[in-house]
């Protein structure tokens, strides 16, 4: 498959390797990376379902914290690795070609302050058509992991009161909240994203805290349809 080196949207000096045809990073990854709240106390971050490392690369512009990332598909992992090396971020970002169910084989006992995830959105049983391209199929459909797998990995590898950030489809928000509660990752904040002023939200960003009290804050819907940058989009939200 032919590769291309692109600008990582408007993040100056960041480049990312992608395939000319097929897998590319999405706006969802940018929104997730921007949504993450990082403090001076943040020591380490884990990114699940990392793709070609768009989320870790963007997060690296906001912190010096160490970032580990896991990507199950070898071809996509290689793109992520090349992007990290090209941007000279090997000292900060480490990517593993592994299933998130096997994190303990690589980082046994390590607990993270923050975990992020831009997962496959679609259940296999609900899908009328699954892409013939295996890479795209695995990236978009729950062929290798489920929501339970994701929340299990997050709760197992988060420090107490650590934060988990997830981007997903609005249509699965009820399932997300139920699953989060099951794994003691109570949802604290919800952001709803739409692309038209009078349109319905299609994306949801959630922030969970491990072993926290119940109570959810839902911020005003954000229309991103005409935005030229997504930097500081969530700056006023808490």
Q: What is the predicted function of each stretch?
A:
Residues 197-238:
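SAM/dcSAM-binding transferase cores
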Residues 15, 21, 144-201:
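Conserved Class I SAM-dependent methyltransferase catalytic core
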Residues 121-149:
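Mobile active-site "lid"/loop adjacent to the S-adenosyl-L-methionine
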């Amino acid at each position: 498959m032919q590769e291309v080196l692109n600008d990582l949207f408007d993040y100056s000096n960041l480049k990312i390797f992608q395939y000319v045809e097929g897998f590319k990073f999405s706006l969802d990854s940018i929104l997730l990376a921007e949504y993450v709240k990082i403090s001076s106390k943040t020591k380490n971050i884990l990114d699940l379902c990392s793709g070609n490392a768009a989320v870790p690369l963007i997060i690296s512009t906001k912190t010096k914290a160490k970032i580990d990332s896991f990507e199950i598909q070898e071809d996509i992992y290689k793109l992520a690795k090349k992007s990290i090396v090209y941007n000279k971020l090997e000292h900060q970002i480490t990517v593993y070609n592994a299933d998130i169910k096997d994190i303990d084989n690589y980082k046994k006992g390590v607990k993270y302050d923050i975990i992020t995830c831009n997962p496959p959105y679609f259940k296999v049983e609900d899908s009328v058509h699954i892409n013939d391209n295996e890479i795209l199929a695995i990236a978009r459909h729950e062929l290798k992991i489920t929501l339970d797998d994701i929340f299990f990995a997050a709760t197992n590898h988060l420090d107490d009161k650590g934060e988990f950030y997830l981007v997903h489809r609005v249509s699965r928000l009820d399932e997300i909240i139920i699953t989060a509660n099951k794994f003691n990752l109570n949802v604290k904040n919800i952001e709803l994203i739409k692309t038209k002023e009078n349109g319905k939200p299609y994306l949801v960003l959630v922030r969970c805290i491990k072993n926290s009290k119940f109570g959810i804050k839902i911020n005003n819907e954000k229309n991103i349809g005409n935005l030229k940058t997504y930097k500081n989009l969530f700056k006023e939200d808490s």
